[in-house]
UniProtKB/Swiss-Prot annotation:
GO cellular component, one term: cytosol
Recorded name of the encoding gene: ppc
Cofactors: Mg(2+)
A biological-process GO annotation: oxaloacetate metabolic process
Protein name: Phosphoenolpyruvate carboxylase
Length: 933
């Protein structure tokens, strides 16, 4: 992105017929406007300084020009505090505007394919359904699939989401104005107005504070999560259902029945207490109330809008008797409109929705109006009324009016209910142990300490208490603050289910679950709150979900579930949950524990073993993938990731976390949001119905080889991170981890405990820190050594390499693993990483650790190219390669500035401007990388 029309970092291939021509033009336009803004508001000198830095950075990046690197260092090291802030903001906004142009171009290219009548692309529901129909899957099988499926991205609040709402709003405005130029035949005068609006938006953006002035509260995080319903979910999810039904109808050559609602958005925001003391019972209630308020407000608006269009007159049409009955109960219309039954019906629905919002305690517009209507008992009654309208229209030759907005509203009501999204509860197993220990102490005469009992003894006591009708809690005041807090949470959970329905709060996740005892402890706590009962009629209104996170726990999780299903009482309990058990697998902590290769491999093996155990016990399995935005935390393209799962492990059931800045990048723009949701649906359909990974059954030696690779990779990773003397110091000094803790980007502390031990550090800031210094260890370290050892020990190096190449060609798991590593390596930069290493005060430690990192990086590159046959990174993904090539020259100066600022700050310059500049660079680099945490 150039600040003026003379400079141009983009390759010269730039004719109007070239497919990326519009992208280049958008980038130039936005860059020129940002440059003009800097010139107008900061002066010509500042403009020239920023442009000099930009051109020098481009020269260094493009030509590996050492003189340019030295020149860049000299400029950046001599900036004043004021100049530093301006330069950081300039390059941060370069990255942001490039992202906007790039997202728009993705949409542009997809629309071009559609207009040209090109075949549907991988990841589209159109192609997925074509493939399953071609295989011979009939309409009834597809209907059964949708009826039993659940696909659920779950929004979580984590300290890597650095965008403010104000910034997101202006991103959308700029994108809308660019779309206007793209799709509309503007007159010269309209084009001038469009450019002025763009300039105004960019100027406002430049003068808008990027950083939050105070740390986010959980309430703030709840509101931030809700904006994506307005941006994308409320309208795009019904659109996807309509698209699926229309495709099925075309394939069946007849009207397809309505498919079941299987795609739903979940949330942890306001229910995730693990390590966050600010999530209380009041906060959880607030989250449920805000969810309900938003969706009821949406329904009221849509009913108003649709009702205004339903001007059909009884003098010209007929209606069903059901609709007549519904219209007769509605408030009156003016005499001039008394012959309009559909309007009367929508007026009645509108009144009942307002009464419902008042009944549920939602504070939304219209609730203070005089209204004697009866509230809906639940969302099913609302859906029933909409169905009466739809049937009447279809029965009386008005089918088209039953489509569009009315069809979408009916689907929204079925998907979102009156609760909007299922809110998950989550807490650490150690907290449950503490609470149960207190309950045990207060209710038994046993001298033993609960925590000192063996696990089998605990299980025996827990099962006995679960069968016993008595309550262990008489008064909250008898217990510690921690126990009181947990008991109040569960009491509030029962109240939320009573008010908003069981679907509002259906899941309880146990962090760091390691055994059956942890599951039964939660069962007992749910029993105390009236959410679960054992005995003659066992049932539960909550799914108990163990989260297995460490390498050891992943290896043992199938045995844990086998033991759990061997308990007759628990098996009976599952019948009340549709005989389905959910298990969550943690990518982040397992990566921090054992490294990239081993984390992925152990999760893959765990899925295989879990599938076998569940099949043997006749229990349905749903896997919940706890992953982040980065490859180091399980991120990467969703389509390939789901297709790479072991056979039988998906079976139409998948939940996965959407975290940090990934939520904004995926779901701010509605077209991109719809595409991402479609991708999840398409991959789940194909993975379930096509059984693409049959290689698992035919090549067991692949697993033997992966076991060897994983063992070597884990040893190399742990040797570096946990066994290298002084590595903790290297990490703390060569990354901005301590400065991240001061950035107001999340409500949770960066560590679970008040400690700077790597074991206690949350996986999110761990990965975020390595991303910011461009080392990105969690996404590749250990792979190079693993392959090197395997090839050398094989005896015949060429034969060993051929085996790995065959595995790569035929096994989706290894393809996805190496593709994700390829992406990480393309964003890493050891030249910049070495500059961060210079911040380490011990020269011997710096030399020792960074030499190990560089050696492993070179081995990774060597063997990645050898196995894939590529000669450069991202050779098979030119779109991503182009994206990184465009953005990197704007990220590099931010990294160089961050290094200099960290050096100043750690040397005692604690000027507020320096702190703010450091935080701005953290924000800017995260924006440029796009999946940093």
């Amino acid at each position: 992105m150039s600040l003026n029309t003379r400079a141009n970092i983009i390759p010269e291939k730039n004719t109007p017929n070239e497919k990326d021509y519009p992208l280049r033009e958008d980038i130039r336009l936005l860059g020129r406007m940002l440059g003009d803004t800097i010139r107008e508001l900061e002066g010509e000198t500042m403009f020239n300084l920023v442009e000099t830095i930009r051109q020098t950075s481009v020269r260094f990046r493009r030509d590996q020009d050492e003189a340019a690197e030295h020149e860049l260092d000299t400029i950046l090291n001599h900036l004043s505090h004021k100049e530093t802030i301006a330069v950081v903001r300039a390059f941060s906004y370069f990255s942001l505007l490039s992202n906007i142009a790039e997202d728009l171009h993705h949409n542009r290219r997809r629309r071009a394919h559609l207009r040209a009548g090109s075949p549907p692309q991988d990841g589209s529901v159109t192609l997925a359904l074509q493939r399953v129909v071609k295989k011979g899957i009939d309409a009834e099988q597809l209907q059964n699939f949708f009826a039993s499926a659940l696909i659920s991205p779950v929004l979580t609040a984590h300290p890597t989401e650095v965008q403010r709402r104000s910034i997101l709003d202006y991103q959308l405005k700029i994108q809308r104005l660019l779309k206007e130029r793209d799709r509309t035949q503007l007159t010269p005068n309209e084009m001038r107005h469009n450019e002025e609006d763009l300039r105004s938006a960019i100027q406002t953006l430049w003068q808008t504070r990027v950083l939050r002035s105070v740390r986010l509260t959980v309430q703030d995080e709840i509101e931030n999560g809700l904006i994506y319903y307005h941006y994308t979910f409320l309208r795009q999810i019904p659109y996807i259902y309509a698209k699926l039904e229309d495709i099925l109808e075309r394939h069946m050559d007849k009207a397809a029945p309505r498919i079941a609602s299987f795609l739903r958005i979940g949330s942890w925001i306001g229910g995730d207490r693990d390590g966050n003391p600010f999530v209380t019972h009041q906060i959880m209630l607030h989250a449920a109330e805000r969810h309900s308020a938003l969706i009821l407000d949406f329904y009221i608006s849509e009913v108003e809008r649709i009702g205004q269009t339903m001007s059909l007159s009884e003098r010209l049409i007929k209606v069903s008797s059901d609709l007549e009955g519904l219209a007769s109960t509605a408030p009156g219309l003016p005499a001039s409109r008394i012959d309009e039954p559909y309007r009367r019906v929508f007026l009645g629905i509108h009144a009942r929705l307002i009464a419902t919002s008042r009944h549920l305690g939602s504070s939304i517009r219209g609730c203070c109006q005089e209204n004697n209507a009866e509230p809906y008992a639940d969302s099913a009654e609302f859906v029933h009324d909409l169905d009466i309208v739809i049937r009447s229209l279809r029965q009386h030759r008005s089918d088209r009016l039953a489509q569009g907005a009315l069809r979408d509203l009916r689907r929204a009501a079925d998907v979102f209910g009156f609760h909007l999204a299922p809110l998950d509860m989550r807490q650490h197993s150690k907290i449950h142990e503490q609470v149960i220990s207190e309950l045990y102490e207060k209710n038994t005469r046993d001298d033993r300490n609960y925590l000192e009992m063996s696990r089998s003894e605990r299980v025996e006591w827990l099962l006995a208490e679960l069968r016993h009708p008595r309550s262990l809690v008489t008064s909250f005041s008898d217990f510690s603050d921690v126990t009181q807090g947990e008991l109040r949470i569960l009491k509030m959970a029962a109240e939320i289910q009573r008010r908003f329905g069981h679907a509002a709060l259906p899941n309880y996740i146990i962090s760091m679950a390691t055994g059956v005892v942890h599951i039964l402890e939660v069962a007992l706590l749910l029993k105390e709150a009236g959410l679960l009962q054992f005995g003659d009629d066992p049932r539960s209104t909550v799914n108990i979900i163990p989260l297995f996170e460490t390498i050891d726990d992943l290896r043992g999780c199938a045995s844990v579930m086998d033991e759990l299903f061997s308990l007759p009482d628990y098996r009976k309990l599952l019948l009340s949950r549709d005989n389905l058990q959910e298990v969550m697998l943690g990518y982040s902590d397992s990566n921090k524990d054992g490294g990239f290769v081993t984390s992925n491999w152990e999760i893959y093996k765990a899925e295989i073993e879990l599938t076998r155990v569940f099949d043997r016990h006749g229990v349905r399995l749903r896997l919940f993938h706890g992953r982040g935005g980065t490859v180091g935390r399980g991120g990467g393209p969703s389509y390939q990731g789901i297709l790479a799962q072991p056979p039988g492990s998906v079976s139409g059931q998948i939940r996965l976390t959407e975290q940090g800045e990934v939520i904004a990048s995926k779901y701010t723009d509605p077209e991109i949001g719809r595409r991402n949701l479609e991708t999840l649906v398409a991959a789940t359909i194909e993975s379930t119905l096509l059984d693409r990974d049959a290689v698992h059954y035919h090549a067991p030696h692949y697993h033997q080889i992966m076991e060897e690779l994983s063992s070597s990779a884990c040893a190399a990773y742990r040797d570096l991170v946990y066994k290298t003397p002084g590595f903790k110091q290297f990490f703390l000094e060569s990354t901005p981890i301590r400065e991240i803790a001061g950035l107001h980007i999340g409500s949770r502390p960066t560590s679970r405990k008040p400690s700077d031990k790597i074991e206690d550090l949350r996986a999110i800031p761990w990965v975020f820190s390595w991303s910011l210094n461009r080392t990105m260890i969690p996404g590749w370290y250990g792979f190079g050594t693993a392959v090197e050892n395997f090839v050398q020990q094989a005896g015949n190096e060429q034969e060993a390499l051929k085996q790995l190449q065959e595995m790569y060609r035929t096994w989706p798991f290894l393809q996805t693993l190496l593709s994700n590593m390829d992406m990480v390596l393309s964003k890493s930069d050891l030249g910049i990483a070495s500059r961060y290493a210079e911040l380490v005060t011990d020269p011997e430690l710096r030399q020792s650790v960074f030499t190990s990192i560089r050696t492993e990086w070179e081995l990774c590159m060597k063997w990645l190219f050898a196995i894939t046959g590529y000669s450069e990174l991202l050779q098979d993904n030119p779109t991503l390669a182009r994206s990184i090539r465009i953005r990197t020259p704007y990220i590099d100066p931010l990294n160089h500035l961050q290094i200099e600022l960290l050096r100043r700050y750690r040397s005692g310059d604690d000027d507020d401007t320096v702190r703010r500049a450091i935080h701005l660079t953290i924000n800017g680099v995260a924006t440029g990388l796009r999946n940093s945490g």
